[in-house]
Structure formats: structure tokens, C-alpha cells
Amino acid sequence: IGQACEFDYSSSIALKTLKNLGYEVVLLNSNPITINTDKALAYKTYIEPINTQNVLKIVEQEGIEAILPTMGGQTALNIMVELHQQGHFEGALKHVKLLGAKIESILKAEDRRAFKECMLNIGLDLPKGGYAYSEEEALGVVKEVGFPCIIRSSFTLGGEGSSVAFNIEEFRDLAKFALEASPISEILIEESLLGCKEFEMEVVRDRKDNCVIVCCIENVDPMGIHTGDSITIAPALTLTDKEYQRMRDASFAVLRAVGVDTGGANVQFAIKDRRLLVIEMNPRVSRSSALASKATLFPIAKVATLLALGHTLEEIQNDITQSTTCFEPTLDYIITKIPHFDFEKFPQVDTTLGTSMKSIGEVMGIGGSFKESLMKALESDYLLKNLHAFLEQPLELEFLKKELRRPNPKRLLYAMHAFSDSLSVDEVHSLSFIDPYFLNEIKEIVQALLELKEADKQALLSDKNTLFGLKSMGLSDALIASFLGIAELEVRQAREALELHPKMYQVDLSANEFKSPTPYLYSTYAPFFPSHKAPPKSTRQKVILIGSSANKIGVGMEFDYALTHASLALKKMGLSPIIINNNPETISTDHDTSDTLYFEPITLEHVLEIVARERDHLLGVVVGFGGQTPLKIAKDLEALNIPLLGTAFKNIEIAEERDLCHQLLDSLQITYPRGLCANSKTQALECLDQLELPLILRPSFVLGGAKMRILRTKEECLDYIENYSFETSLLMDSFLEDALELDVDAICDLKSVFVCSVLEHIEPAGIHSGDSTCFIP
């Protein structure tokens, strides 16, 4: 948590940049499902544990002259600190240069005490607080600070060890936990800033002291929630120009004082009663750097790598604009990032969000307005699927107020429910501390949806202006249909009859002031900008690749790895790959991985708009490299005569639909555990009577073992069946005790099947293969 695809993205870009300059780069990484460990990228790759011993061994064996630690997240920085503490930079690493960040800078930024002293020395304001190295010292500090207070561990990532304490009983336990989480047993105890506005500045600086703000990111959620768990937007919408300029100047001062002379950094601020407070900084590329790069098309990882080598901003050319990188991006669109949580897999877990990160992925929506951007992001994470039913569901006022007070992944939806229950913006703001500007925008969306329930369906669907107004708010066909009580197809047909389609605009750094040749596109129904010309389309044969969206449990870097390689393979074949994805952390959403990138929700509506635009010379759509996400729309695509390249949907269905799979195995005379398939509660209860316990119950069309259970009693089975939706069929299998599990990977070219590998699991059957230790051969 807190360290995912974004560091594979930044390190891969760094490797590519260094290689193009003629450097021989040696990579140390222990994660095999990354692009950066591909043989083609580094001169040599060591898939070994990342520890000081291996760093020293590689430096000696390979004659290493410099180390670039700013692309590997907290792991890389902490290893540098360990090497420093062990005295190796005065010994074995004496002649090795550290690029991007000096040891002194890392210590100043990551050590809470040193950072605070550094900020006070340059006259910047910080939350009042103190440091502690033991439980006794912590109790002394909290007497001065008072409650509620925020506890932060030094040298950790993703807010590990951080928390908010509201009383002395909570404080004792949380302080002990935070001290254990810090590798140097140091914690910072600060005044609470709960409810204050939070901002992040992505900054780059070169050796000549040229500084550029790449992006100002505003957190929609107030302080008290880790930025990785917050809904964020860019550019900032509620800052005054005076506040922005103060923050900009403070960011430059922070980089100078800490000593980030050649590279990128992330600086976080809070605003409390007109006080501008510095919260922390990361002296490296971060999760927010990847988001800022995708939001602005400013290649932070590449620029930070070149700056680390001593280049200046005026010397570095931006590949996209073909001009210098020494100017600050200007956006004429809004991006919204929504974090993805997988709490439903862990029903016992507390879903309250705090200063320690809990999300495992994120999606980004791009639109011409905040409303459109927000709704596209919510749609990208499939959070609007049951919005109509959720708003119809009666909730007690006290429960609603409690959920608005409590930071949680559904708080935005509870705000929508509050507006549907006639609560005012002021009331929701006083409970949630979300800025009234955002709440007013959300309220207008809810009012538009509620009006649909009373609308004359035929009149609305034949009125182009009304439908355009709804679409420009970011409302999907499916969402409009659910509130009208009709099928999504009817809304789509109405739009087609009215010739109402979104415009495709290019993401660029200059609000279309300079020509951008990069086909990195988003759709919008926002009013047309005359200066925006339609982006060019490829005249070569094209293939659309659909991505996997947000990282989830069971959907991680491995799908981005596959998607990226598929795109590169198509390029080698002379074809034009088009990627549809909405995950800002990934390499597949980098502007040069494909010939055209659409940063869009992976839904039938958006994919069909893209297919219609790219229909000339289109060979087909590939759904096999995005995990379960593209498979959800594969059937509809095939039904609309859009060719699916690779496995046909009827064959995907045989593999995913348990009953069809059993029929195939029977025809091939292959044995499998005795099992039955149920499509309703009644059928499931009948199957239960025919099978012996224990059972393994599995839905069709799921990934990562979602909702799969091993059940050993009839009562457990009855409870599971009672709560199962039966949207897809349920397979009820006899569970094989003490069985050996194997994974076989194979590829087929219609004639031959080639077995690539056989993995043997150490754990017995019943433990998901993603959680099982395995070995080859």
C-alpha cells in the first residue's frame, strides 16, 4: 500500500532516458512483474532482495560510478540512508556519486525533526508539535499539543504508523505502534489540522536554480486523510491567486532549503484560518508525480532523471511540445483522481480513513468541468452502478450525519444522499468539512438526477439541449437510464438520433496555445472551444487494446505489463495500437506506449464512442490483457459486430461460466471435483442437498477470488446463498482436502499449444494462487 505501479513507471522512464544517452544502467529490483525488469531496458538486471549487502556487491562487481535512488520510492531512499548510517559513503562507496538527492537532503526531508528545524529556519509556518523517541517522551509532548493530535512516523511511506488520537487511551497505543513503524524510532506529534484544506505542489528544480511548478493538486477531502486516500483534482479550484503565489514561493523555498538541487519533489501544504502550513515533502518522484505527469503531459520522471545528470530545464526538450521544459503547464480541463479500496474482501476491517493509507489503486477522470471530471472518475471506478437504488434507500438522519462526519470511501455518495434528503450545503459542509464549492457542484448533479424521475421520458430523449445539459455534467447513458427507468440502449439510440456525441480533445500543457502532436485524448460534452482542432487519426491498420483500470486485489502491475507488451508488439508488426485505460499510475497510459491513448472510463458507452471514431482501418478490439474489467463489456461488443481479436467471447464464456466449463471437461473426459451450478436461490438449496461438505462456492466472471468461500457447515452455506445476488451463476464444488495445486501457462496459435511454464504451489488447494508461494520448475 502506497508503493505500486507509479514507481515501475518512473524507474522505467528513467532507464529509457539513461539508455538513450548511452549510459550502461544496472537495475536492482526484486519484483518480477515490472516493466523495468525487462531484459531490453537495463544493461544488467539483478532480481535480488533490495538490501545494503546486495547494493555493495553490485557496485563492486559492475564498477558502478553513480546511484539514482529517487525513482524507487521509499525503499530506495531508505537503503541509501542505511548505507550512510553504516559509513559506506566514506568507505566502499566513497567514489560513487548519488544522483537526484544528496544524503543530507534525504535526511532533512525524511527525518521529521530535521525537516521542522529546516522550515523554521526559512520562516515557514508548521503545525505546532514535538518529537519523541519513547513512549514517555511522547506523553510529555502530547501534554503541550493537546487533543486531537496527529502522530507521524519518520522514514515511512503511505503514512505507515501515522494516526489521529482523540484521547490519552488511544494515544498510548497509537504512539507505541508509530515508534515501532519508524526505522529510527522517531515520531512527530502535531496539532490536529482535521478539516483544513490540503494541497500538493509538484516541483522540479535544476542546478541553476530554475524552478517550475508542474502541477498544483487540490484535495477534495480535508486534512486528516492521507493524500493517497483522498479524492484529488487538478488544477486547484478553490485557491485565490494570492494563496497560490504564496504556496508557489514557499515550494521553491522548501526545495532550496532541503537541498533538492537537481530533480523533482512533492511538497504538501494545509491552509488553516489563512495560515499557510507546510506539512511535509518527498525529495523524490512519488504517486502524485505520476498523477501530475498524466494530468499535464509534463514528463516529470524523464525531466528529473536529466536534471539529476546535471542538465538544466532550458536545455531539456519536451518531446510533446518540441519546446523547452522551462515553463509551467496550463490546463483548460479538469482532472479528478478517485482512490480504489477493496474493503469488501475484508468485511471485518475498519473502513474509516485516516493518515495511514488504505487504498490500493486509483482512477482518473478528465472533463471540461469539475462535474464532468468527477462523474467520469466515479464511473471509472464503477461507483455509480447502484446510485439510483442507493439514493432511494431510506437512511436514518443520525446514521447519515455520522457517515458524513466519518471519513470513509463512500462519503461522497453519502453527501449525494444527504442532498436527496434536502440537507443544505452548509449542513453537509459542517459535518464533512468538504469545501462548499465542491458540495454545490455535487448538489446540482443530484438535483438533475432527481428531476429525471419526474421527467417525461419521450420529451426528454427528443430534446437535444436538455440531453446535452445532462451529458455535459458527466452523466453516463447508464445513469440517466436508471433514473428514467429505461434501458441504457434507449438513451444511446436517442443520442444517436439527435447526433449528440462527445468531442475528443487532446491533453496538452499549454491550454492549446502551442501545437501538440501527441494523440493523448479525452472526451467531453463541455462547450466547444473554437481553437481546438480535431486530433488526427491514424491511417494505418489499428487495434484497440482495453486496459484493466484501477489496481485492485488480483489486478495489479501484471496486467499493465501485458498490455504494454501487447502495444509494443503491435507497433513492431507495423500496426497502430490504441489503448483505452484510466489508471494514472501505469506505463500503458504513458503517451508514447501506444499510437493513440484514450484516457476514458472502461464502459460500453465510452468504448463505443472510440470505436466509432476509429472505425476506419480498425481490425478489432483486444480484451485479453486487462483482467476482468474488459470482459464485462466483451459480450456487448461482440453482439454489436465489433470483432474481438484473440479468444472469442463464446470461448471466454466457457472458461468463466462454470457450468459451460464442466460440459467442456466432460466432453474431453477430464476429471474435476464434483460440483453443480445454480442460477437462483432455489436451485442453490437443491444443489446443497445433493453435495457433501466441505464445499467451495464460487461465482462466475470474477478475479482474485472475489466472493469465493470454503464452507464446512450447512449453516455457513445457507448464509452465503441467502446473501448471494445471483447476477452470475454460482458454482458449488466439493472441496478437495490436502490436494496439490499447479498453475499451467500456455499459448495457442490455432494449431499448436505451447506450455510456457508449470508452477507448483507450496500451500495446499484452498489458498488462492495469488496468495500462495510457488516455484518453477
Protein language model regions, located:
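Charge-enriched amphipathic alpha-helical scaffolds
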Residues: 487-501
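A conserved helix-loop-beta module that forms one wall/lid of the active-site cleft
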Residues: 92-162, 647-708
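Extended, domain-scale alpha-helical bundle/helix-rich regions
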Residues: 473, 479-483
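ATP-dependent carboxylate activation and anion-phosphoryl transfer catalytic cores
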Residues: 1-35, 39-54, 58-64, 75, ...
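Periplasmic-binding protein-like
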Residues: 65-71, 618-625
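Structural motif
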Residues: 28, 70, 101, 129-132, ...
